[in-house]
């Protein structure tokens, strides 16, 4: 592995860590305002940030929704939304709850 590629890998890890911290801070603030539990997952179903226990949020739930043509979907108490940046799907947002507040 060349030095440049090692640096690039390290930089990507640092960027992902910073992005995860920013996302966590954002959803913590949103939860404080909305009182709704939120989770952000990457397209492989790995948790990026969350205000709730993962419990019944499976990898298959996240990856299946990410692969579907739907932009949002309600499955039980989970409200799933796709997060895009300039048209590229990056994350899946999960809001948990049965009240009207979840339909932010």
State each model region's role.
Residues 1-104:
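Alpha-helical/coil-rich non-catalytic "connector" segments in signaling and regulatory proteins
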């Amino acid at each position: 592995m060349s030095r440049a590629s090692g640096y690039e890998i390290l930089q990507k890890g640092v960027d992902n860590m910073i992005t995860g911290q920013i996302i966590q801070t954002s959803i913590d603030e949103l939860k404080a305002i909305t009182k709704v539990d939120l989770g952000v997952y990457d397209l492989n179903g790995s948790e990026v940030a969350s205000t709730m226990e993962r419990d019944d949020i499976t990898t298959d739930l996240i990856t299946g929704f990410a692969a579907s043509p739907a932009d949002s979907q309600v499955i039980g108490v989970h409200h799933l939304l796709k997060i895009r940046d300039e048209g590229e799907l990056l994350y899946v947002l999960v809001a948990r709850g049965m009240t009207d507040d979840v339909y932010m």
